[in-house]
């Protein structure tokens, strides 16, 4: 009797579907306009016979939205929670992803934008709107190596994080870093309005710091970037500098070597940028400052090592205390380029750290800046706006 009972159960056991050890991955798309409720795309493994897809279709309570019989094998449709669980247990299923709304990439214009934003989205001086693709740096990370950032500033929209401090308190007690972060990626004052902003504090609340501390901050960025999800790449900004330092230049180069784009301020001494660091490091993107009249800002450093110029005088941006401030310097020009790097990486993909600087140089408006000393490249940043 015992033997016959076991034998009687065998056909049932053999007829049961095989279960997998772990459920198939369930993906939720990021940075989309909207998700479609209870609607999923079921992707089967490439080696799966289509009969397995047919078996999955039988689980649906209604008609499928699409059946895929080509290179992409599977189906889509409304799937309730119980059926979703059954499908995820099917070893033939590769993954399941929630359906989402996808729209044409569109350019949008921010009316009455800060003058610096307006200037980098047009070839000619005059327009007051900032025109940009609404990808806006999505999927990128922007490291601000500075005085820290006020991460909870309302204009950062929850996209900002103060990570670490090598100078006392983790808070930005100066305002400089928060201003820089705002130009890179704040909602109102930023170039790349969807980038993630990451603060690394290497300067004190009085605005000073040691070379050794800055190097420690750079090493932190390299380490952090390896474990952080930034699918469209990472950029960094250093709106700081001092006399020539082989150590600081070497540390700045290590960011490039680790495929992190770096924009640095050319300096505010009205001298050759070859005399200061990290602006003199050849592999970084060194940024000089211009005025709203397209003249070299009187304070801006210059020379053949300046890759690009960007707005840097009377720049309105975020400030500590959840406020705003208008200040000047190549410190304000550099984040326009860090933001532009994040913007282009989100729009076109990340081509590599040095290649991204080359892309910015290639896009630049040439020959419009007045007052440049001989030998200084006459290149003003431009975001590639097709109507610009």
UniProtKB/Swiss-Prot annotation:
Cellular-component GO terms for this entry: extracellular region
Short name of any one Pfam family annotated for the protein: Peptidase_S8
Positions of the Peptidase S8 domain: 114-388
Source organism, top-level taxon: Eukaryota
Enzyme Commission code(s) on record: 3.4.21.-
Compartments reported by the entry: Secreted
Keyword Iron: no
Leader sequence residues: 1-15
InterPro entries assigned: PCSK9_ProteinaseK-like, Peptidase_S8/S53_dom, Peptidase_S8/S53_dom_sf, Peptidase_S8_Asp-AS, Peptidase_S8_His-AS, Peptidase_S8_Ser-AS, Peptidase_S8_subtilisin-like, Peptidase_S8_subtilisin-rel
GO biological process, one term: proteolysis
Activity control mechanisms: The elicitor proteolytic activity is completely inhibited by PMSF. The activity is also significantly reduced by aprotinin (leading to 37% residual activity), by leupeptin (leading to 54% residual activity), by the ovomucoid trypsin inhibitor (leading to 65% residual activity), and by p-aminobenzamidine (leading to 26% residual activity).
Presence of keyword Chaperone: no
Site residues by UniProt (Important for catalytic activity): 268
Function field: Extracellular elicitor protein that induces a strong defense response in strawberry and confers both local and systemic plant resistance against the fungal pathogen Colletotricum acutatum, the casual agent of anthracnose disease. AsES activates a cascade of defense responses, including calcium influx, oxidative burst, hypersensitive cell-death response (HR), accumulation of autofluorescent compounds, cell-wall reinforcement with callose and lignin deposition, salicylic acid accumulation, and expression of defense-related genes, such as PR1, PG1, MYB30, RBOH-D, RBOH-F, CHI23, and FLS.
Entry protein name: Subtilisin-like serine protease AsES
Lineage per the UniProt record: Eukaryota, Fungi, Dikarya, Ascomycota, Pezizomycotina
